[in-house]
């Protein structure tokens, strides 16, 4: 991401909602609702204030900075091979995130340089490029200053030698003066004497000035001294303030370290000023070595950037997937750069061992237990006599066969069809429990029936239709006369369909008004609706075909235009004339040759035509009879408007079979889904469902926090009470590692947790109401789909690949099904995972339903037929819709 000057910049993040309009910036894909915000951000991107985060180029627009970053990342995507082994050492066995790893590795590479690298640096305000020779570990600033002084002395000595060679100065005088100076410089003078000498010199000067009568200069000197004293005092005060600030900063850092607060990322280049690390660098142009501090090194060639470091980490290493994962370098690179001897840190040693064990198991290698057993067998065999060599060979062969089997074991879960399901006792596969399919209709149409019932009950407020149980709906469809459930469901569905634009505008609006439908004319409107549907579908198909023809014609024209060349029209015309001429000639030749044959064949052709006409008349008559018979006996076999329209013209609705009625309702439901009312209701449910999910997350977090706080308080109490109890500590040590004592929860916390659990149950019920899409439990090896709904708790439904339906309705059948399913397959593992948490609830509901059925049968067996006829009211007949028209 480009930098705003030198600071990082964040893009605008807006949640895009479907159906709303936004102003979008193309190169950032930012969405803005207000035009003003869009213009302000676009003008900001046009300003030349952006810098490339990779190359460091400045004074760019945002788009130019993005392009420079893209080009730079394409050119250099990995660290050089010279630095790669050092990077691998740094990455191996680290327990940090990818972002932390990139920051730390980038900082590590800025702080360290290695022999052989080409580097640019500054020395005495002059830029040089050279090659690093070595790191000087025991090197100080004093050594650097002495080296600089030696260089200066060497330069000054060269200048003095040039002056001594001149004829004006004799050699003797120079030697004496130099020797005397060296002798004086060798004498040690104390600091106090130096100060006294300075003061004495100043006093002599002052006396001379007094003698000269310069009184004005004395006053000026005193003022200057006073000013200097004041400046010194101010400097001392500033130093004291700086020290106090540094102390405060150190205290703040200690507080931050204690509280473990998140710190802002600091540029590692700023840390180089405090580091004292020196490198010996050889410069080819100068032909000599330079000793340079790390802060004076400007950059290495090729340069290193953060995106490059991130890409190298991704390509070179991978983080283990288990909890508390660490970074692991690819084994090929470890062998290539001889990094096999890297020490594993103590904090990660157990995790590394477990990870290696998992790898061996996945690859099919021997487990630790089997290895130990094989070692014990070998030791026992060696202790035996030589006469038992045959038995040893047999044991070795058996061990080899076991190891081969373990290596051949596949890594589960695998494809369900590939799982070997042969039972060791019987040698056959376990059979699936037989499911019952004694529905009131065909098993292929039962899925449509369930879909219609769920739709009518779920969208009751939109359709204005009171809910009803599945059993009543079954009986209402089977009934030979009108029932309120059947009539109201048809009316409410058609009313929502007539709100569609194809029926609410134009000529259909007059005949298909929502208010015109009643319980008296609903059958007539149903027939008229399907007649209109047939016409509408035919018109739509014609429009589609016309559009396809137009597209084909456009494509042909475009191809012809593309194939045309300059001067090709004349050639085409000539070719056409030639072709026409040839054809004419051929036609003439054929007429001359075949003129004699035509007269002979005329009589034969006339006879054949008469025979064919007679046969066609007979076939037409038979076809018409067959069509009439088919139309009379035609059956609705699918939710198709044409077949439904034909059947409703010739048959009464209540003479139709149950399957035909289900297909009619299924077609009406599919049409109502496209209405605007249903769409708005779905959007509201999605929003409300998201709100409930957020509330649920908050309650779960509260519950976790309560348990953690209670556990922490209990642990503190235990530590205080058990300080002097050595016996309890010894007992805890003797316990196995896996046994963990669950500390009891306090009664106050228990009450709060119960309240939260009740809230969660209420929220789960709300989510079920707002969820429109039904989800299956899963699939088995043969792709059968298993369904369970809380609205229909008495059965587990099974949907086959062909569309047929079955069900299980007892605990024994469910247990047999769980035994039949295999955990080693992908699909069946998921199915078992979804069944197990719901097992207790499903079993309780199945048993409850079976008890109710038994009680009902026993109760009805005691009653006489006369009492049954008098006092039994059928609920599907007495049902009434609470919503008004």
Curated annotation (Swiss-Prot):
Keywords: Coiled coil, Nucleus
UniProt-annotated location(s): Nucleus
Biased composition (Basic and acidic residues): 210-264, 578-603
Cellular component terms per the entry's GO annotation: chromatin; nucleus
Ranges where the DDT domain occurs: 443-503
Amino acid composition bias (Low complexity), ranges on this chain: 154-180, 380-396
PROSITE patterns: DDT (PS50827), WAC (PS51136)
Region span, Disordered: 141-184, 201-264, 367-431, 562-632, 707-744
UniProt-listed InterPro entries: DDT_dom (IPR018501), DDT_domain (IPR053271), WHIM1_dom (IPR028942), WHIM2_dom (IPR028941), WSTF_Acf1_Cbp146 (IPR013136)
Coiled coil feature spans: 217-260, 530-565, 593-628, 674-782
Domain WAC per the UniProt entry, residue ranges: 20-125
A Pfam family this chain is assigned to: WAC_Acf1_DNA_bd
Broad class of where this protein is predominantly found: nucleus
Membrane-crossing residue ranges in chain numbering: none
Name this polypeptide is given: DDT domain-containing protein DDB_G0282237
Organism: Dictyostelium discoideum
